[in-house]
Each structure stands twice: as structure tokens, then as C-alpha cells.
Amino acid sequence: NYSVVDNGALEGKTLDELIRTYGKQLLGEKVVEQFGSIFPLLIKFIDARDNLSIQVHPDDELAKKRHNSFGKTEMWYVVDADKGAKLRSGFSEQITPKEYKERVLNNTITDVLQEYEIHPGDVFFLPAGRVHSIGAGSFIAEIQQTSDITYRIYDFNRKDANGKTRELH
């Protein structure tokens, strides 16, 4: 999934190639100093027909320490939503680290997550470290830091293609 120039003198060049060649002119000196040749944003369109996993992403400091990478702060823009579609973002009540672990282990973490019924045009800011998930019937534009680090904490006991429960973190 690469962004590629569609026409003109640079036709066929990927965004990565453009950044390597024209980094400072394209992104500015400060962005290149901080991110090097990595484009700092990733944009996804997510058409969720089922509830997606409950997850959380590390901040820059933790991601650097554990993965030598960037963390992930996100923003969701609701493009479309079925009637009654919901997102989860953050906790609905204060919980202790012990209660958090217990709820993850006994599959009740969703009971303490804040749910929001969504409508086209809604926007959600998800700072790194906030537990979140996209619900069934949601079509979301997700704008985020470029990072692949996701800690899946609950996945509704789904199985992968081999019949095994997907890995939780």
C-alpha cells in the first residue's frame, strides 16, 4: 500500500522515494530532522463490518524504549455509520491496574469502556495510551502517526485462519 505519483515528471515515484530525494523541500527541515525519511502520517479507511479488537498504542517514549520506533496517536473521522454503530474510547470509570488485568483475563474489559454512538462527521482524538476500538457498522477515516505498534488487549475470542485465538498483548 504505497502512495504513488499518478502523472507528471515524477509519475510512478513512491512517496518514500520523493521523501528520500526531496525531503526538506517536501516536508520541511524540522519534520525531516525528527522523522528522517519516514512520512510521519498514515491514513487508513476502515470499513468495519464486525467489532474490531480492543487495543492501545504506546506513546513515543515507550515505543522508542521497547521497539526503537515511534508511538501512535490517532484521530478518527466518521465518514459513515449504520444506525446504532458505536466506537469505544477510554474508560467509563476509574479502574486500578489490578482490576484492568482481571477484566482482560476474564473478558469483561468492554464493561468499563466508554461507548459513543456515532454519526457521519463525528471526530475522535485518541492520544497514545488510550484504550479504544471501532464497532461494527462504522466507516472511519483514521489519521495516525506512522507506526505499526499495536497492543491488542481483547479480541472477542475470535480465531485466526488456523483456528487459534489471536495473540493478545
Model feature map: region roles:
Residues 1-95, 156-169:
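Transition-metal
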Residues 18, 22, 103, 112:
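Residues that form generic nucleotide/phosphate-binding pockets
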Residues 54-57, 117-136, 145:
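Conserved metal-binding segment of the jelly-roll/cupin
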Residues 62-63, 84-89, 95-100, 127, ...:
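Short, well-ordered, mixed-charge alpha-helical segments that flank or form enzyme active sites
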Residues 65, 110-115:
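Short helix-to-loop capping/linker segments positioned immediately adjacent to catalytic or ligand/cofactor-binding
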Residues 70, 110, 122, 126:
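Short, glycine/acidic-rich beta->alpha junctions
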Residues 73, 135-138:
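Short edge beta-strand segments in beta-sheet-rich domains
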Residues 88-111, 141-169:
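Double-stranded beta-helix
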